[in-house]
C-alpha cells in the first residue's frame, strides 16, 4: 500500500522527488504542463440543491470528469512535464462526513495518470478548512504531501504556496510564520539563483481582474495581495496560477500574469469543465484553457504545440 500511495507523496521536505534543483536546474528547451483546479468531489450536487455547507453526499460526476481529464492528458503527445492541481481536491471539509471516501475516490481516479507525468498538489480551503489548524495541515500532508514546497522543471523554478495562511492563519500562527520564513528564503533564492522563469501555484487568486479590486471571498485581502505582488515582482515571478473561483479570470499587472483557471468539477459561471495548457518557452509563458471535451477529441491546440518545436 505504501508504494501505491507514493505517487501522491512526492512533495516532502519542501521539495519534490525527481524535480529538484540538482536534476532540473538547466534550461532544456520549450515544454508544457497542465494546470487543473477544483475537482472538488461532492460540490456539483451540493450546489444544485443549495446545500454547499454540507460535505456533499454524491460525487460520481466529479469522478467521471477527473477520469476524463486523466485519459485526455494521457493521450497528449508530447507528454506534459507535470500536472498541477491547484486545490480543493474534495468538497467535504476536514472532519466532515464523506471526506475520507471522497479522497479515496479521487486518488483512485488519479491513479490512472501516466506514471511518467508527475502529479503536483496544491492545498485549498476545502482541503485545510477556511481557518486551518495544525491538525488539518497535518491531515493534508499525510494524504497529499507537503502543503508548500519548491521544485524545478527544465530550468524553471516553481513555488507551491499554502494560500490559506494568507486568508486566515488565526488557528496556526506558528505554521504561518514558518511558511513566511520559507517563502522569503525562496524569493531571495530566486533573485540570486539564475532560472529561466519563476512560477507560483496557489489556490486563492491574488486578484480576479485587477490588483486594486475590492476584497472578495474569491481573492486575497488587498493589503496582503499588494504586499505579495511587490515581493513576487522583485523576485522576478512571471506568473501566478490559481483556482478557487470556478470560472476563468485573471489579468496581467506590470509583467506579472495572474492566471485564474476554472474547475475540473463544478462550474459557477459560463465556462465548461476543463484544464489549462501552459507552454513555457525561453522568453514567455503562453496558456489557454481547454475544455475536457476538446482535449479528449482534438488534444491541445496546434498553435500551442508548434511552440514546442
From Swiss-Prot:
Q: Which residues bind a divalent metal cation 1?
A: 51, 88
**InterPro entries referenced in this protein's UniProt entry, alphabetically:** Calcineurin-like_PHP_ApaH, Metallo-depent_PP-like, MPP_CSTP1, STPP_CPPED1
Record's protein name: Serine/threonine-protein phosphatase CPPED1
* Alphabetic keyword roster: Cytoplasm, Hydrolase, Metal-binding
Reaction catalysed by this enzyme: O-phospho-L-seryl-[protein] + H2O = L-seryl-[protein] + phosphate; O-phospho-L-threonyl-[protein] + H2O = L-threonyl-[protein] + phosphate
Record's cofactor remark: Binds 2 divalent metal cations.
UniProt keyword Metal-binding, yes or no: yes
For this protein, the Enzyme Commission number is 3.1.3.16
Question: What does the UniProt entry say about where the protein is found?
Answer: Cytoplasm
Q: Which Gene Ontology cellular component terms are annotated?
A: cytoplasm
Q: Which family does it belong to?
A: Belongs to the metallophosphoesterase superfamily. CPPED1 family.
Names of the cofactor(s): a divalent metal cation
Principal location: cytoplasm
Binding-site residues, a divalent metal cation 2: 88, 125, 244
Organism per entry:
Danio rerio
Family annotation (Gene3D superfamilies): 3.60.21.10
Q: Does the keyword Cytoplasm apply?
A: yes
Q: What does this protein do?
A: Protein phosphatase involved in the dephosphorylation of AKT kinase family.
Q: Name one GO molecular function term.
A: metal ion binding
